[in-house]
Amino acid sequence: MMRSYVAVLVALAVAIGLPMAASAQARPLDAAQARPDLSGNWIRGGRIDFGPWDFTEAGRQKFESYDFKKDDPAYGCIGASWTRVWLNPNVLVRITQAAETVRLQYEWMDIDRRLPLVDSASPNPKRITIPKMPALGRSTAWYDGDALVIDTIDFAPGYVSTMEKWAGMPQSRSMHTVERLRRTGDVLTVETTHVDPTYYRKPLVVSIEYRKSEFELMEYGCTPEDAAVVAPR
């Protein structure tokens, strides 16, 4: 089973460019190479596709023991995972692209993600964390053709989702995610591949569509005191 899982990881690395040891050796981005224009304000709208998942026994037990009344970190104004952040409806994401960085400002929880752009072949790229949100790990980014790729490791234990029928899908410290952001017209597709051998027998792929928006980014202003008022009891 482990040999099969490793084979899946190798195939995944080749397909999407995960910077695992001895995996993708993508060429550095030429400074003159055109980058996709992802800038602007976006709001969730359109397709959400959770690919099939196959829990390990530990993953199944973790999923079945989830209790939203005490396990959802949103009641403490904390994002559970990047997929959970992207899933939130009716709030904006503003993307700002610069020569050496890309900034994603999420209205939900006022998350400000300032990512360094790196060489995808670097064995030890610069990564950033989000203060007070350890479940969001350490991230770095690069461009790959028409996509912005965001690679994240070192997650704290948490949940891929705390929403709808996916609530309680777990993530462990071994979780490794790759987000690929692509734009087609006024549609932004965020495809996230989750690799977590502790809880899943094969990679979990989630795809979420966003639409261009004329609304402006606003302060979310969550405080633990306010969140506690609406928290279930």
Each language-model region and where it sits:
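Bacterial N-terminal signal peptides
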Residues: 7-19
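PEST-like low-complexity, intrinsically disordered acidic/proline/serine-rich tracts
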Residues: 24-233
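Positively charged n-region of N-terminal signal peptides that target proteins for export
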Residues: 1-5
